[in-house]
Amino acid sequence: MKASQHIQNILTRLPHQPGVYKHFNEAGVVIYVGKAKDLKKRVSSYFNRKTYENNKTKLLVRKIRDIEWIVAPTEQDALLLENNLIKEYRPVYNILLKDDKTFPFIVLKN
């Protein structure tokens, strides 16, 4: 799906770092929150596809009008931040982690 010039400009500025991204609709409402090991690769992947796994993703991409991101020190930090932002914004396109009864966890191994 072809991205608007505004979105293309955002994609060029995304870093190759872990973090969280927020997709906004034309009303400025957060419609999706996601995490990435590599923000540039992950966010760009939404706009470089010819086909999508499901209609939900296709509809989401059509509604994206702006993108913000937050760089995280690690992928684990991004996961925790993603969970908090999903609970804060309750984006319509996020299904997992949406209810307050789910808890992300990290296993520490030696």
What label would you give each PLM region?
Residues 1-110:
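Acidic, glycine-enriched active-site microenvironments
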